[in-house]
From Swiss-Prot:
It comes from Bacillus subtilis (strain 168). Residues 25-90 are annotated as: Disordered. Pfam families: gerPA (PF10676). InterPro entries: Spore_germination_GerPA. This is Uncharacterized protein YdgB. The gene is ydgB. Residues 30-54, 65-79 have a biased composition (Polar residues).
Amino acid sequence: MPSTVINLYYLKINSISGNGSITIGEAAYNSPTNNQKSQGTNSSFGDTSPTESVMENFLNDPDVNDQTSIGNSDTSNVNAPPIAPPPILD
């Protein structure tokens, strides 16, 4: 079995948001979701400074439907048998 070596000498990431992800190597994502609602800011100035965040999170969420994966259009059809076309009748 061959081995894979990934050398990362310098990696700097400035921002990741929403459903963002960092993948080093092979990966497969099936319908990634993010079920968090936050309002505020998170900032860091310079390479070695600590992060500072000012967040306001409220419990009131009137639109509850976006907090679930029911009705998600991303479905997995991996290795599914093909659907046969309907016969043509003359």
